[in-house]
């Protein structure tokens, strides 16, 4: 296969530079054998948009499956393939076996006709979108593809096959331990939501206070701005309340039922009521397995399956406690689902009858405690993982959160943002940063003292804290007394302006 120049990303594709580079490197790699890539990501992330742009730039065959019977799906695939190769008559494959064999045959070395205008040595890009729909009606497909991939690891081939889908449990299962395609993929790409900074730019919001609230509700899902809301963007922080009522909380808006659809679309979710109860428990602040079980009135062992399914679907994430082995907390990954469970579901009947303004007026406390607050913590961890990393004494270490127990005071100190480097060999585990996050509280010296106490306790347990900085993250600001403490050389203050790159943090870590 001849080496292809890397095609540039179209200007209409916002952000996604790393994803584009990964895809084009996969397509243009000069390997004379078949290559397989798996592209997944929850719905509305722009996967199809990205892959269509790739096919436009690189040439190739794009097919998007739909929900249907096996016969109908095979007929649609056959017709699309016939059109692609310019056949005057439609193909009528009797089985998927025949269709897959023919498809790979098009990419055999020196074969012409795979792509209009392509040279015999050019890679043949094939994108099969919504692949889980096909697997549902033709479960033998992964095995058929495995057979052809294995064959064309020996024989020469120009095939660059990308299988794409949104049912995360199905897509994740394609490469699982005993799956036919295990070990066959040269690319495994998960298209994730935009980070909070990219999302603010995408929504054209320049006010950090508005951007943070907006991200706490709709997250970084690209489709929500244009496809769902037709560019209805809150004009200012003052407009945010009205915007919430006319969009997410309006029964006439597509976003109103979106959280329910996101759950219903996952292939492995049957009893949606149970899954909504699990998500509601987490949204209410019951983030441990025992807490979730207690909230919904089940035993811990009885909720293992729904927790696993929600994790496999990328709707729930288990975050390990960086200070206590074996301890973990669950977090809802999709902000809109968290907002639905915390604010909308408890008042669903009233919202359906058009009482958005009244419901939202009574939800301010819940929004701050259950939506904006926890989301702000995740944003602060994202900041430390990315743009804020240069402020630390080390570029290494795991970013997370955890609890430090203070036996003397009989209390637990919650650390919202921590950077911990595990020990290896002769080196002790070290802590580079301990941080506390507050959404609606002006932070003062007391918060800093609590972090300092946690640092002492960790040092007493044998962790290296000699270069451990203390950070206070607040969306509401800091007292003058706390600002004065930044002269010490081990304190950082990070507000919304700093989080969004509008200003540098106050203080320095020496």
Q: Can you say where each PLM-predicted feature lies in the sequence?
A:
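Accessory nucleic acid-recognition modules appended to NTPase machines
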Residues: 228-230, 237-415
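Domain-level recognition of nuclease-like catalytic cores that cleave nucleotide substrates
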Residues: 464-510
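Mid-core helix/loop region of P-loop NTP-binding domains shared across ATPases and GTPases
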Residues: 88-127, 133-137, 144, 148-158
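Sensor-1/coupling segment of RecA-like P-loop NTPase cores
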Residues: 37-41, 133-137, 141-178
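Conserved catalytic cores of phosphodiester-cleaving nucleases, focusing on short active-site segments
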Residues: 384, 413-423, 428-441, 451, ...
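Conserved small helical "lid"/interfacial subdomain of P-loop NTPases
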Residues: 186-211
């Amino acid at each position: 296969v001849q080496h292809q120049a890397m095609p540039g990303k179209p200007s209409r594709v916002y952000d996604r530079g790393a994803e584009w580079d990964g895809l084009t490197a996969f397509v243009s790699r000069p390997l004379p054998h078949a290559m397989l890539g798996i592209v997944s990501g929850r719905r509305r992330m722009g996967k199809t948009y990205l892959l269509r742009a790739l096919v436009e730039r690189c040439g190739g065959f794009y097919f998007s499956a739909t929900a249907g019977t096996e016969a109908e799906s095979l007929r649609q695939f056959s017709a699309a393939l016939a059109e692609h190769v310019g056949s005057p008559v439609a193909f009528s494959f009797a089985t998927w076996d025949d269709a897959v064999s023919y498809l790979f045959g098009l990419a055999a070395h020196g074969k012409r006709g795979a792509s209009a205008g392509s040279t015999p040595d050019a890679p043949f890009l094939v994108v099969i979108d919504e692949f889980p729909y096909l697997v549902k009606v033709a479960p033998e497909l992964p095995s058929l593809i495995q057979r052809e991939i294995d064959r064309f690891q020996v024989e020469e081939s120009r095939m660059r096959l990308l299988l794409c889908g949104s049912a995360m449990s199905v897509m994740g299962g394609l490469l699982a331990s005993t799956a036919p395609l295990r070990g066959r993929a040269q690319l495994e790409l998960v298209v994730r939501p935009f980070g909070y900074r990219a999302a603010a730019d995408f929504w054209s919001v320049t006010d950090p206070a508005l951007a943070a609230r907006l991200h706490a509700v709709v997250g970084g899902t690209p489709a929500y701005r244009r496809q769902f809301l037709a560019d209805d963007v809150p004009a200012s922080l003052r407009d945010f309340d009205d915007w919430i009522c006319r969009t997410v909380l309006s029964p006439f808006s597509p976003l109103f039922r979106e959280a329910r659809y996101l759950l219903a679309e996952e292939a492995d979710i049957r009893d949606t009521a149970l899954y909504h109860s699990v998500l509601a428990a987490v949204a209410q602040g019951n983030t441990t397995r025992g807490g979730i079980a207690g909230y919904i009135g089940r035993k811990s062992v009885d909720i293992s399956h729904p927790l696993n399914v929600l994790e496999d679907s990328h709707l729930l994430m288990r975050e390990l406690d960086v200070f206590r082995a074996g301890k973990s907390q669950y977090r809802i990954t999709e902000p809109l689902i968290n907002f639905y469970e915390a604010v909308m579901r408890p008042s669903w009947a009233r919202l359906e009858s058009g009482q958005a303004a009244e419901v939202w007026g009574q939800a301010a406390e819940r929004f701050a405690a259950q939506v904006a607050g926890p989301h702000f913590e995740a944003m602060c961890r994202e900041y430390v993982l990315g743009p804020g990393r240069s402020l630390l004494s080390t570029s290494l270490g795991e970013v997370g959160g955890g609890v430090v127990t203070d036996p003397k005071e009989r209390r637990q100190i919650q650390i919202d943002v921590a950077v911990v480097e595990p020990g290896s060999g002769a080196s002790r585990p070290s802590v580079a940063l301990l941080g506390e996050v507050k959404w609606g509280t002006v932070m003062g010296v007391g918060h800093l003292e609590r972090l300092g106490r946690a640092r002492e306790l960790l040092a007493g347990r044998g962790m290296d804290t000699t270069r451990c900085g203390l950070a206070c993250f607040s969306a509401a600001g800091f007292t003058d007394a706390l600002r004065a403490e930044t002269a010490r050389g081990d304190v950082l203050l990070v507000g919304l302006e700093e989080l969004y790159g509008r200003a540098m943090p106050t203080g320095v870590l020496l």
